[in-house]
Amino acid sequence: EVFNKFGEVYFSSTYPGVVKAWHKHKEMTLNYAVILGEIKFVLYDDRPNSPTKGNIQELFISPQNYILVTVPPLIWNGFKCIGTTESIIANCADVPHKANEINRMHPTDKSIPYDWGIELK
């Protein structure tokens, strides 16, 4: 079951070339879907005992390439608008927003080995 409970729904808008990253939630599970435009969505796992520690995953999402992305707590994530127009992302989270529940890093922070200017294949 994808949705275990309801906390809130919110929308995030971004424009061509703009990166919104990095952040991870301590408690919140995210359920992202792109409703307008094209997004490169990136996940990074730095959990100490995770079998996927150090892995990066890129997803290219749009209404034409629909993917519901579920991000569990403690996974770094972010996105970049890769289309030519505004993109809008919807998130159906399982807990309401709390400011002290989220960690943030700059998109170019070297703690995450990712370059937003390239695509991993």
Kindly give the residue locations of the regions a language model identified.
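Non-catalytic, conserved peripheral segments adjacent to functional cores
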Residues: E1-L68, I82-K121
